[in-house]
Amino acid sequence: MIEPVFAADPTRLLIAAAVGIILLLLLIIKFKIHPVLSLVISALFIGLGAGMPVPTLVSTVEKGAGDTLQGIVLLIGLGSLFGGILEVSGGAQCVAQTLINKFGESKAGIALGITGLVVGTTVFFEAGVVILIPLAFGLAKKTKKSTLYYVIPLLAGLATGFAFIPPSAGSVLVANMLHVDLGIMIAVGVPVGILSLLFAGILWSKFIGSRINPGLPSNIQEVREEEEANLPSFATVLCIILVPLILILCSTISAYIPGIDAVRPVLEFLGTPFVALIIAVLLAMYFLGTRQGYDGEQLKKILDRSLRPTGQILLVITGGGIIRWVLQDCGMGNIIGPALEKSGLPLVLVAFLIAALIRASVGAAVVAMTMAAGIMAAMPGVAELSPVYLAAMVCAINGGATAFSHVNDSGFWLVGSLLEMDEKMTLKSWTMMETIVGITGLVCGVVISLFA
């Protein structure tokens, strides 16, 4: 259990949270108040409605803002710089054209989904998004199709990789808490991840992409429409994209390789996500900037323009994080878990429901994973279950922690801001995609548990 900062009365907290979320939706959708202001107002309403003392509420809001931005500011900023160079230089255009040539327009989204799945096992969701989303925009611009046709497979791949397949932080975290061997987790997680990508990424993107087209983001800069011969080479662009991913992966696996104590600190430093992105930006500036004929002043203008939307993106993410922390510090997660423990439902289903309810109420996937895994690990008899059954439980927990992303989740606002979608579009596309990932994880977990 995560001890709350303020132990709110359960009934009062549930009412305050429900009214606060309704208030948030009304402020944004009906009264057209900016999401940043609406999020903070709703967070304050929930805290005061739950009876949280004003000094504690102020401290929670400040902590929520700081902890939400911690580690993500540099990722978003550096990712924007990287994406700006990749886009204006024609690098994204080159990759988009190559994917279309190799897979055809109808299968380029599948290629992006597989790319996201692989990348999602090695990096956090936010880092993968900011590195790879320019490729989806490039494909959408080239084919004139809805951006969702390409972005949804990419996002689904990243989400499923993070949730189900080691060495991702999400799958390793819960597997360790339930004492699941990572080899077994990989054997169970890979097919679950592939099925989740199929349903949430490939099939859902075709459905929603034919119905919603948010258009290309307004900050997409004008790309020099050149002949393919004048574009940077596919190999060059691919290598630059892979550099931060390989560095992050090397940092992750170095912890499991004996006899490299001398170089491990170097690998860990270079594999720190923001360091890896700095290296990628510098490589992009030279190979996609200077080598493509851009001078220093032109590169500066490209970088300046690519950073313009990041302030609003970060503020919206912060607002979502503040709501999450207010709910968490009031003890929302500790209300949900014990109630379901006594329900008598199958353990895999209980695991999913605990994680899903915490995810829906608190917003943060990792918090939902941690709290649900802690509750399940403490339940009688869980330690005696078979390794495969426990791996199925990991899939159910992480599926529940992925599903039902909405206005209290910073990821909801990150995706909505990057794609410049309003809240209705984000709910219809992103929230549904995340929920399909989660339900697929549950169904697979239940089926596997029957044979474990």
Q: What residue spans do the PLM features occupy?
A:
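Long, contiguous bundles of hydrophobic transmembrane helices that form the permeation core
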Residues: 2-11, 187-301, 419
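Membrane-interfacial loop-to-helix junctions in multi-pass transporters
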Residues: 11-15, 54, 66-72, 99-114, ...
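Hydrophobic core segments of alpha-helical transmembrane domains in multi-pass membrane transport
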Residues: 16-28, 40-49, 76-83, 116-119, ...
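Short helix-coil transition sites and intra-membrane helix breaks within transmembrane domains
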Residues: 30-35, 69-72, 83-93, 119-133, ...
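Core transmembrane alpha-helical segments of multi-pass membrane transporters/permeases
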Residues: 37-40, 44, 60-93, 269-331
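Juxtamembrane helix-boundary/capping and inter-helix hinge elements in multi-pass membrane proteins
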Residues: 50, 87-92, 102-106, 139-150, ...
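Hydrophobic transmembrane alpha-helices that form the pore/transport pathway of multi-pass ion
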Residues: 100-188, 361-399
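C-terminal transmembrane helix pair
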Residues: 103-106, 193, 347-452
